[in-house]
């Protein structure tokens, strides 16, 4: 979401709007309220201000990289015990950056971290800034309390020191005065006693008063000096405390501002170099302090005051002890040339003291960050922290997705997805493709949100292109489809209009392809589509109705409304296309146009004279009667429709028919619906794409361009497109290839996913059905529409016992690969208007493959139907040949029971089966064991003769039983 005002920008940065207004005013951007507009320039000025306040500089820093290489040899024994000398080369690389002079301002004195540290700490800086702000808040509170205590203690200490100093000076003055008095006394002793006594008596009071006056003056001066020093110390301590509080406040504000700046920079695409704020450091050992105070070649030393101000803030406040006074930096200096400071790792200089806890919240942890992590490198950028709560992800699930990709989207292992699917009762592998519904169930099962979406679908660009086209709409010719039942004269009617003879050259006198022609009439151009009338070409007729503007429904006057006539009416009504009825064959004596009208009214097509909206025109394709009236009505309907299409725009159309020509390659008949198709255009048709190399009209003549409603044949596609596919002209062949490959993969993945989902169901169906005969077929046709119609017609022949299995169907001639496939699958090859080449014929003869050629769809369907009938199991029927009555029963040793019988009806044969009836109830069914007349075995006994009969495995024969004699015959079945 683009932030247009201060309030929106503050919500985006997750900070109060008032704080943002203060920062904007500090940056020189005058914004008074939250509703003020905010431009990109204002944001840039705010970012520059924040960077400068954090110490970022624009100047390039000079740096030098030094590499040291050291080679040594070591000897090591291998597995055989033999000593080997190994060359070991150690390379060390250090980068030194020249910093600014130490005497510059505080922003220039701050140490800029190296690029590697900045990149590593950029990701965790926001969390660290928050922790540092909380820590600084605590430290500020405790610092204020400690500072007050320090001020009081410092004032008392200095007062005591001043008082002691004044007392010492006063004692020295008294001692000096005493020594002077003693010297004078010694000099006076040499004089006369009288005079000395007199002088002593006179000078003693004066001397005492002088000493008292000098002592009082010295005390007053000492008190004034002590008070002045105490006042200076208190003022200095207060200034220092205020400076430290101001520094803490600035650092807290800087940390918060830096966190906001980091959030903004993480959202921007370009990489912004932000100078990192130096985090507070714990107290350091003397060696590290000396190195820091002096500085190295690439790290300047800090001033003593700054180091002393930074140390109390980083020390743990719970200790309660006052901070030690900062010693002068010059007392603990270390020369750069001594030791290993030039090649030593920076982390050695940042080694902290041992503490019971980390007061910095993990901000300052380096190579040896804590007491238990000594010697271990824990890089915070690469260390993993387990989430405290489960992460719910939004998973975009395409139409098909593999198990591995689905697991990757959820950031889990593929084995977890496989486990869940096993619990759901489906065994999958890591590379198996799942359909969208199954994948979404798995995502929900694992606790994530599943969204059905098409990510990176290149076809979305096509929709955007359609919306953006605003070319001028111009009138276009109408597209008229001729539909009707087979043999009702559709092609003959078009032949008369076009003055051509297409019908005479068609196999069997029927149309088996969809044809496209355009005819110039005195009133304009009309494009005709001729569709087949056979029931097998339903899909072809549906495509014709989809691409048309007007339908001419041809009905034979002597035949009336037939099944395909009704189907054509339903296609036209489904497409919302007006119908013009042509009642053909009115020249025949048995023609009855009135009956045709009544039948069409029953189907919902009402003529104009009956109050409907469908013109009925009686015509004769043989004599030409009524043809002009038919064209007049068609053009009248076209004027009412006001057909328009853009001309000066990329072409769009539909594939009417497609085929594979041996010399030309894939050829597609395209009806242009809008725009202009030119030679050299890049076209996309379904999964096929390519550049138009050649373009022919319906007469086979080359043409350079085709406008709306004009049918043309184009060459140059990558493969044979599907009939009915939409044709689009694209400006870029790379984009066309991308969309075509995407469609191919999508079609293949969806097909595989559906096959996988239906495996279990089909397995159960086959188990329930038992043994089913399969007739494998390979179908090669001349055009896509014929191949589609033939496949659908043959699949309809399948029954519960015999099933047609289409192993492969395609457009083009029969090749060696087709014969090899037929050999492997034991299939029969059917060529519809195609032939096999020489190599394929030789291979088929060698392998015994049956190749059948047809040019009429009836013949192909009938022969396949006959072959399937031969595969059916024969039907067994029982035929009763005679009836026998038992007159007497004989018990014969070693033979069994023999019945003396009379043949009452028909004939009894030795090979017949017998059914025993007792009281008209069947009690046994079996075979004859013997058939005798007197003592001779006979083959048959006719009606009216007596015979003796014995049955296999049945001796319970009673007088009065009847034997029904029958034979089982097998009858061939048909579909």
Swiss-Prot record:
Any Gene Ontology CC annotation: cytosol
Region called G1, residue ranges: 484-491
Comp. bias regions, Low complexity: 104-115, 178-211, 302-330
Pfam families per the UniProt record, alphabetical: EF-G_D2, GTP_EFTU, GTP_EFTU_D2, IF-2, IF2_assoc, IF2_N
Region of interest: Disordered: 48-84, 96-388
Subcellular location as annotated: Cytoplasm
Compositionally biased intervals (Basic and acidic residues): 48-63, 120-177, 212-263
Gene3D superfamilies for the chain: P-loop containing nucleotide triphosphate hydrolases (3.40.50.300), Putative DNA-binding domain, N-terminal subdomain of bacterial translation initiation factor IF2 (3.30.56.50), Translation factors (2.40.30.10), Translation initiation factor IF- 2, domain 3 (3.40.50.10050)
SUPFAM superfamilies registered for this protein in UniProt: Initiation factor IF2/eIF5b, domain 3, P-loop containing nucleoside triphosphate hydrolases, Putative DNA-binding domain, Translation proteins
Binding of GTP, residues: 484-491, 530-534, 584-587
Gene Ontology molecular function terms on file: GTP binding; GTPase activity; guanosine tetraphosphate binding; translation initiation factor activity
Major location (coarse): cytoplasm
Annotated region (G3), positions in chain: 530-533
Chain residue ranges for the region called G2: 509-513
Ranges of compositional bias, category Gly residues: 359-372
Keyword Nucleotide-binding: yes
This protein's UniProt keywords: Cytoplasm, GTP-binding, Initiation factor, Nucleotide-binding, Protein biosynthesis
Residue ranges, annotated region (G4): 584-587
Function: One of the essential components for the initiation of protein synthesis. Protects formylmethionyl-tRNA from spontaneous hydrolysis and promotes its binding to the 30S ribosomal subunits. Also involved in the hydrolysis of GTP during the formation of the 70S ribosomal complex.
Recorded family membership: Belongs to the TRAFAC class translation factor GTPase superfamily. Classic translation factor GTPase family. IF-2 subfamily.
Protein name: Translation initiation factor IF-2
Protein source organism: Burkholderia pseudomallei (strain K96243)
Gene name as annotated: infB
């Amino acid at each position: 979401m683009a932030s247009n005002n201060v309030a929106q920008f503050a919500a985006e940065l997750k900070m109060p709007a008032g704080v943002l207004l203060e920062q904007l005013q500090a940056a020189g951007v005058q914004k008074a309220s939250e509703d003020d507009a905010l431009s990109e320039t204002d944001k840039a000025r705010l970012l520059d201000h924040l960077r400068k306040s954090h110490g970022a500089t624009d100047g390039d820093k000079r740096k030098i990289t030094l590499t040291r290489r050291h080679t040594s040899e070591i000897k090591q024994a291998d597995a055989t015990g033999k000593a080997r000398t190994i060359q070991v080369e150690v390379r060390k690389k250090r980068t030194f950056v020249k910093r600014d002079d130490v005497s510059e301002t505080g922003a220039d004195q701050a140490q800029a971290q190296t690029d590697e540290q900045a990149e590593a700490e950029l990701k965790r800086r926001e969390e660290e800034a928050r922790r540092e702000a909380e820590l600084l808040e605590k430290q500020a509170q405790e610092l204020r309390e400690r500072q007050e205590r320090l001020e009081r203690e410092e004032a008392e200490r200095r007062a005591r020191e001043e008082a002691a100093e004044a007392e010492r000076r006063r004692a020295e003055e008294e001692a000096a005065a005493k020594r002077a008095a003693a010297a004078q006394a010694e000099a006076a002793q040499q004089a006369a006693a009288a005079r000395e006594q007199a002088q002593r008596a006179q000078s003693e009071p004066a001397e005492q008063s002088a000493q008292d006056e000098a002592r009082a003056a010295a005390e007053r001066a000492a008190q004034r000096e002590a008070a002045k020093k105490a006042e200076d110390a208190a003022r200095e301590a207060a200034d220092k405390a205020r400076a430290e509080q101001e520094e803490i406040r600035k650092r807290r504000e800087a940390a918060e501002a830096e966190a906001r700046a980091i959030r903004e920079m993480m959202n921007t695409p370009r990489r912004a170099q932000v100078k990192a704020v130096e985090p507070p450091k714990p107290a350091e050992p003397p060696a590290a302090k000396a190195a820091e105070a002096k500085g190295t070649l690439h790290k300047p030393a800090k001033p003593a005051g700054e180091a002393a101000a930074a140390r109390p803030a980083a020390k743990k406040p719970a200790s309660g002890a006052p901070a030690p006074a900062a010693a002068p930096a010059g007392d603990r200096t270390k020369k750069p040339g001594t030791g290993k400071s030039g090649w030593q790792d920076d982390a050695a200089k940042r080694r902290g003291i041992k503490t019971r806890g980390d007061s910095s919240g993990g901000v300052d942890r380096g190579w040896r960050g804590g007491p238990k992590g000594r010697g271990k490198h824990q890089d915070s950028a690469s260390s993993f922290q387990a989430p405290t709560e489960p992460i719910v992800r939004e998973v975009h699930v395409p139409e098909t997705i593999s198990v591995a990709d689905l697991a990757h989207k959820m950031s889990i292992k593929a084995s977890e997805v496989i486990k869940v699917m096993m619990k759901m009762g489906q065994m999958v592998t890591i590379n198996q493709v799942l359909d969208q519904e199954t994948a979404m169930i798995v995502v929900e099962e694992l606790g994530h949100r599943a969204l059905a979406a098409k990510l990176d679908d290149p076809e979305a660009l096509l929709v955007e292109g359609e919306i953006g086209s605003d070319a001028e709409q111009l009138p276009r010719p109408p597209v008229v489809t001729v539909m009707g039942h087979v043999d009702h004269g559709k092609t003959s009617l078009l032949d008369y209009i076009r003055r051509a003879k297409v019908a005479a050259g068609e196999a069997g006198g029927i149309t088996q392809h969809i044809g496209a022609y355009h005819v110039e009439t005195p009133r304009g151009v009309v494009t005709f589509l001729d569709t087949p009338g056979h029931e097998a070409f339903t899909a072809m007729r549906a495509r014709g109705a989809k691409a048309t503007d007007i339908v001419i429904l041809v009905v034979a006057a002597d035949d009336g409304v037939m099944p395909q006539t009704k189907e054509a009416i339903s296609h036209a009504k489904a497409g919302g296309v007006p119908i013009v009825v042509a009642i053909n064959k009115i020249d025949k004596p048995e023609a009855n146009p009135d009956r045709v009208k009544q039948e069409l009214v029953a189907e919902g097509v009402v003529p104009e004279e009956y109050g409907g909206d469908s013109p009925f025109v009686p015509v004769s394709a043989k004599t030409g009667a009524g043809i002009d009236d038919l064209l007049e009505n068609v053009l009248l309907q076209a004027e009412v429709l006001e057909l328009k299409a853009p001309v000066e725009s990329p072409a769009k159309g539909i594939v009417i028919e497609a085929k594979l020509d041996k010399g030309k390659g894939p050829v597609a008949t395209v009806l242009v619906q809008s725009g202009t198709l030119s030679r050299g255009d890049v076209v996309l048709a379904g999964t096929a794409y390519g550049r138009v190399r050649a373009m022919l009209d319906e007469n086979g003549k080359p043409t350079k361009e085709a406008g709306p409603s004009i049918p043309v044949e184009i060459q140059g596609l990558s493969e044979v497109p599907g009939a009915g596919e939409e044709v689009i002209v694209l400006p870029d062949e790379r984009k066309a290839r991308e969309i075509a490959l995407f469609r191919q993969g999508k079609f293949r993945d969806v097909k595989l996913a559906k096959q996988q989902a239906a495996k279990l169901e089909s397995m159960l169906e086959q188990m329930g059905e038992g043994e089913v005969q399969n007739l494998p077929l390979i179908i090669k046709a001349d055009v896509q529409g014929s191949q589609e119609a033939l496949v659908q017609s043959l699949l309809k022949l399948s029954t519960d016992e015999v099933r047609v299995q289409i192993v492969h169907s395609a457009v083009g001639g029969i090749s060696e690969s087709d014969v090899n496939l037929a050999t492997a699958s034991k299939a029969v090859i059917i060529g519809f208007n195609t032939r096999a080449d020489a190599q394929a014929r030789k291979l088929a003869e060698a392998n015994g493959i049956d190749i059948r050629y047809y040019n009429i769809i009836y013949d192909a369907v009938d022969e396949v139907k006959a072959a399937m009938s031969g595969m059916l199991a024969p039907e067994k029927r029982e035929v009763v040949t005679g009836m026998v009555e038992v007159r007497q029963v004989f018990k014969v040793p070693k033979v069994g029971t023999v019945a003396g019988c009379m043949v009452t009806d028909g004939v009894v044969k030795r090979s017949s089966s017998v059914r025993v009836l007792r009281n008209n109830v069947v009690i046994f069914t079996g075979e004859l064991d013997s058939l005798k007349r007197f003592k001779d075995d006979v083959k048959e006994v006719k009606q009216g003769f007596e015979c003796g009969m014995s049955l296999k495995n049945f001796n319970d024969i009673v007088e009065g039983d009847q034997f029904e004699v029958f034979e089982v015959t097998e009858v061939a079945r048909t579909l």
